[in-house]
């Protein structure tokens, strides 16, 4: 193999690695943006906006969550001076799916039937996202739940 061929092959490999890295960074940013927007809308009970960031099969879980929110829950949330905030802790992308670990602060925790929710200072949750075409969407297979404090 000549020096010229070696240089061309090396250049092609470096270019391929750069291209793959750029795609990965683009996906990371898109996953983070979708997950954070979903979390901020979901935990601030802007469920219509949250549903726009979900796969079609996730709508039933958004509707179920909405159907279980009482006026007492809304009153507790409206009494707060600060809204819920979400920070992304970790993203793991595997092809057209991604798993996100998120920290949520100052959110309404509704975990008891027949009793108004209560404010939670901080909790963690996990989301799964799927890539549909060029768009990342949250793919719920149940209610979004707090996994730990």
Residue positions per predicted region:
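Sec-dependent bacterial lipoprotein signal peptides
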Residues: 1-21
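Short, low-complexity N-terminal intrinsically disordered segments enriched in polar/charged residues
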Residues: 21-44, 52
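Exposed beta-sheet edge and beta->alpha loop/turn motif
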Residues: 93-149
